[in-house]
Amino acid sequence: VVVGGNARQQFHDARGYGRPAGGNEIRLARVEAAHLLLRGDLTAVVDHDGSADRLSFEEFFVASAAAAERFALRFLVYADLRDRGFYLTPARAGWPGAAEADNDLIVPPRGTKPGDDEPAYRIAVVGERESLPADELANLTLAVVDEESEISYLETATPEFDGGTTYSPPAGITGSLIGDRVVVWDAPEEFYDHGFYGQPLEVREAIID
């Protein structure tokens, strides 16, 4: 969405919306334009590629949801973070900040503008029933949107494990593969006590008794 007039000063320079498009014009991503429509900062969006109709917030939102995958979820998170006082930008080519495939929104550090510094948060927007590959989660902040449009933010990181053990399990230990686990019938005590392997069956038996 291209906005003219004094858009660069009013929206980009002062509030971090969009990216410069030459002169005073800026380009807005769909979530940015929808948020400005919702706030009343834009009165309408004109569809020059279609019927040239002036689209209200509702009409633009419905059209964007049909045109862009997961637009509604991304808009909910974008609007929520804006309402919390964050500057942020879509993670897409040409917009401030580094665009990466595994995140949807980029939040710069407080007191800076998008693209000025390394992002403080990389936001991946997901629905609460979506499955996520564990190896793609490190160093992302998940914005999980539930079926009632409530949003939970979950930070992820790559942990560092300190310490170790000098225990080496004895050779020749055998077990039975039962379903998705192995039962070692005659495991030595140090197998669990010092090697921290598995769970002793007698603990479960004591609980049952």
Residue positions per predicted region:
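Conserved phosphate-interacting/catalytic interface
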Residues: 1-79, 83-209
